[in-house]
Amino acid sequence: METFLFTSESVNEGHPDKLCDQISDAVLDACLEQDPDSKVACETCTKTNMVMVFGEITTKATVDYEKIVRDTCRAIGFVSDDVGLDADKCKVLVNIEQQSPDIAQGVHGHFTKCPEEIGAGDQGHMFGYATDETPELMPLSHVLATKLGARLTEVRKNGTCAWLRPDGKTQVTVEYYNDKGAMVPIRVHTVLISTQHDETVTNDEIARDLKEHVIKPVIPEKYLDEKTIFHLNPSGRFVIGGPHGDAGLTGRKIIIDTYGGWGAHGGGAFSGKDPTKVDRSGAYIVRQAAKSVVANGMARRALVQVSYAIGVPEPLSVFVDTYETGLIPDKEILKIVKESFDFRPGMMTINLDLKRGGNGRFLKTAAYGHFGRDDPDFTWEVVKPLKWDKPQA
């Protein structure tokens, strides 16, 4: 049996880029909670002792940007300079302007009240992917890397591994078998964890705790064997982290946010963007489409692409590829997808309830992945029943 290796990575909520994603989405939540028609394009950057929020926001909401920044940093665990940032003492800079009126009139059709006529917020192409290799219909390499990162945060915050600090990265290499286009995971080949830690802990303690409290609870035993390779803090020291260690910027972890390198990516980031930005809403609807194709048994694996022009409601193109795993031809699946999903931005917003912010709805998406999550707020993960005629055996 011929196999191959595929690797996916993830980063923790304390990684500087992910900190920025979370602040941008916390701002989005605050705007949408008070004004569901808010137009938000919020970027964040950070470096030692500084966080800056900037972009274009048109909203009726009253938003305390500085408070959102400090609250988000504090919730992650950035409470002193020695962990990488002090939420209460860092400088917070804000440079927010209103959305360009040129964009507004093109996108909103001179502020039409008709959702069917709302144009795309920009040009671009987005991809959705699904695979039957996990219950989440997500790639195993990505699922494991993401869950390891989430588990690191859990054992830090609950005190199981008190030596942990907020920043960290994970990476998982899985050995796969290609079963006529479908991906079948055989085993975990390599596990890599690099996590920020305090001065007091030894490398041996780090390795022992990571294996016992992070890897064991996350990676199913059937995927681990005596040949599995573990690289646990291989650099030997990771005390300086967070924005003190590296600059951070919104939108730099787009593969971690999606499918861990599987499928494809159109290049647009998600965080800090309201649903008129098809970078986000378009990617959400094609995930729902791809997941529904696989969940309905039409194929074992599916990729769906959609593309847009700024100001135009109808998509320019919709594409489906089942990697030759479809029980019916891809062109028939494409027809079903186009009949079953409304790809117009105004209708995607309604059908996926994307104007509803608050309660950390979009903040939750900004760490540990936008897809494959079992959470009612992730409306794009709901499988849609599709009508199709299964061929006779």
Swiss-Prot record:
InterPro entries: ADOMET_SYNTHASE_CS (IPR022631), S-AdoMet_synt_C (IPR022630), S-AdoMet_synt_central (IPR022629), S-AdoMet_synt_N (IPR022628), S-AdoMet_synthetase (IPR002133), S-AdoMet_synthetase_sfam (IPR022636). S-nitrosylated in the presence of NO. The inhibition of SAM1 activity by S-nitrosylation could contribute to the cross-talk between ethylene and NO signaling. Mg(2+) binds at E9. It is an enzyme of class 2 (transferase). The keyword Nucleotide-binding applies. Its EC number is 2.5.1.6. It catalyses: L-methionine + ATP + H2O = S-adenosyl-L-methionine + phosphate + diphosphate. Binds 2 divalent ions per subunit. The metal ions interact primarily with the substrate. Can utilize magnesium, manganese or cobalt (in vitro). Binds 1 potassium ion per subunit. The potassium ion interacts primarily with the substrate. The modification S-nitrosocysteine is found at C114. Highly expressed in stems and roots. Reversibly inhibited by NO. Inhibited by 5,5'-dithiobis-2-nitrobenzoic acid (DTNB) and N-ethylmaleimide (NEM) (in vitro). L-methionine binds at E56, Q99, D246, K277. Pathway: Amino-acid biosynthesis; S-adenosyl-L-methionine biosynthesis; S-adenosyl-L-methionine from L-methionine: step 1/1. The keyword ATP-binding applies. ATP binds at H15, D167, G168, K169, S235, G236, R237, F238, D246, R252, K253, A269, K273, K277. One of its GO terms (biological process) is S-adenosylmethionine biosynthetic process. Its main location: cytoplasm. One of its GO terms (molecular function) is metal ion binding. Its cofactor is Mn(2+); Mg(2+); Co(2+); K(+). It is found in: Cytoplasm. It holds the Pfam family S-AdoMet_synt_M. PANTHER family: S-ADENOSYLMETHIONINE SYNTHETASE (PTHR11964). Belongs to the AdoMet synthase family. This is S-adenosylmethionine synthase 1. It comes from Arabidopsis thaliana (Mouse-ear cress). The gene is SAM1.
